[in-house]
């Protein structure tokens, strides 16, 4: 029995991935591994089993496909690839194990090297010490020289300061002379821009002359429809003709278009004159429309007389129709009045005999069933593990302690610092005192 246990532990992992293909295919290989691998499986089970199982997987599929003909040949190829991929990752883990053994020996050597590096720098500092001995020898001689140099420089600066003060005033005036020379030329240029300002004004009027040339032609067409309307207002247009004659002369060229402008003004007055002429005729025709209004009232009167004549006949008909139906209901009511007594008799006779015996038995059953469940709620006792639910809790013979009202808790006085007096959200709440 002990040697049999290891092989089954190795088989299940192999059975899980390829059970979807063909469970019976993997049964024969299960018989071969137990006798051959039991002893070596224990020490290196993780290294050898994955390497040995791929070959048996490749052989069985090659033997079984021929009997199944084509369908099995199509399914195994895609399923054969995953099993080939699984063993490869199992082979890689052992490859990573040896490199883990190498890093530990790598760490000690670097720790040995740093101490070797620190020793040489400690030897170099003493090399820098001799040059520190030389500078002190260099410093004393310069200390001897500076005192000799300080005296002459104090004598020279006063001689040097006056000349520089004389030069700056000489330099400032020339730049001041140049700006005035530059400003006049720009002043000469502005007058050059003035003449062009005189030219644009004459440019603007010509465009003003062109629009009037465009507007008159459309105005010439309406006067074609106005000839018959020019006759009635001969008195009013003459005064209106004079103002338009005054406006064109300032434009110099408009006088050429004066004739069309004379026609345009009469266009507006006649239009204003048209409404007055149009309004009177309708007022004159209003009497023509009035007669129809006079006819309308007499037309309404007769209909008012007719409706009463028309309403009367319909009112006469309904009463003639309603009485016959009303006559029938009274004939029907007496018959039902006689039937109720017949309906009342059966309920009085049958139900009283049937109901009393039916209600008696149920009333006897509830009292026997209900009392036990109703005993539990009134007690309101918590169930305990020591006593069954149908037993009462053992009585407590100790006398209950007298109830004493607890004293009211009075918080100690709060000493507010000066910073608490002005709070943005108002004063702090105060507990009530009793």
UniProtKB/Swiss-Prot annotation:
Keyword Repeat (UniProt): yes
Region (Disordered): 1-434
Family annotation (InterPro entries): Proline-rich_CW_protein
UniProt biased composition (Basic and acidic residues): 7-24, 78-94, 109-132, 141-191, 239-255, 282-293, 302-319, 340-357
Stretches with biased composition (Pro residues): 25-43, 51-77, 95-108, 192-205, 256-269, 320-339, 358-372
Comp. bias regions, Basic residues: 389-402
Region (36 X 8 AA approximate repeats of P-P-P-H-E-K-P-P): 6-407
GO biological process, one term: nodulation
Keywords associated with the record: Nodulation, Repeat
Domain of life: Eukaryota
Functional summary from the UniProt entry: Involved in early stages of root nodule development.
Family to which this protein belongs: Belongs to the nodulin 75 family.
Name under which the protein is recorded: Early nodulin-75
Gene: ENOD2
């Amino acid at each position: 029995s002990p040697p049999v246990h290891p092989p089954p532990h190795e088989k299940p992992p192999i059975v899980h991935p390829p059970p979807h293909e063909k469970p019976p295919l993997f049964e024969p290989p299960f018989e071969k591994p137990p006798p051959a691998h039991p002893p070596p499986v224990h020490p290196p089970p993780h290294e050898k089993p994955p390497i040995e199982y791929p070959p048996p997987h490749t052989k069985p599929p090659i033997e079984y496909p021929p009997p199944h003909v084509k369908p099995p040949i199509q399914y195994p190829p895609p399923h054969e690839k995953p099993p080939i991929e699984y063993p490869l990752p199992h082979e890689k883990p052992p490859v990573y194990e040896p490199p883990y053994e190498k890093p530990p020996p790598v760490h000690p050597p670097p720790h040995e090297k740093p101490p070797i590096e620190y020793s040489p720098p400690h030897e170099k500092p003493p090399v820098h010490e001799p040059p520190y001995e030389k500078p002190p020898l260099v410093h004393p001689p310069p200390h001897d020289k500076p005192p000799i140099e300080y005296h002459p420089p104090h004598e020279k600066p006063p001689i040097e300061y006056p000349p520089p003060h004389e030069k700056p005033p000489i330099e400032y005036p020339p730049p001041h002379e140049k700006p005035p020379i530059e400003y006049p030329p720009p002043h000469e240029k502005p007058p050059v821009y003035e003449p062009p300002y005189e030219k644009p004004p004459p440019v603007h009027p010509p465009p003003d002359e062109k629009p009037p040339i465009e507007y008159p032609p459309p105005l010439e067409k309406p006067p074609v429809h106005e000839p018959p309307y020019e006759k009635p207002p001969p008195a009013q247009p003459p005064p209106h003709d004079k103002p338009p004659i005054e406006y064109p002369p300032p434009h110099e060229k408009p006088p050429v278009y004066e004739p069309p402008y004379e026609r345009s003004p009469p266009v507006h007055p006649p239009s204003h004159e048209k409404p007055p002429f149009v309004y009177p005729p309708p007022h004159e025709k209003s009497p023509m429309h009035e007669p129809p209004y006079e006819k309308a009232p007499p037309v309404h009167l007769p209909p008012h007389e007719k409706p009463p004549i028309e309403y009367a006949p319909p009112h006469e008909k309904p009463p003639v129709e309603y009485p016959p139906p009303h006559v029938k209901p009274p004939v029907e009511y007496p018959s039902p009045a006689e039937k109720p007594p017949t309906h009342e008799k059966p309920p009085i006779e049958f139900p009283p005999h049937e109901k009393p015996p039916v209600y008696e038995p149920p009333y006897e059953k509830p009292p026997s069933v209900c009392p036990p469940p109703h005993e539990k709620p009134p007690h309101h006792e918590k169930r305990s593990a020591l006593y069954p639910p149908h037993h009462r809790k053992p009585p407590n013979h100790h006398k209950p302690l007298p109830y004493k009202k607890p004293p009211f808790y009075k918080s100690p006085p709060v000493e507010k610092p000066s910073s608490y007096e002005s709070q943005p959200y108002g004063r702090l709440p105060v507990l009530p005192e009793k």
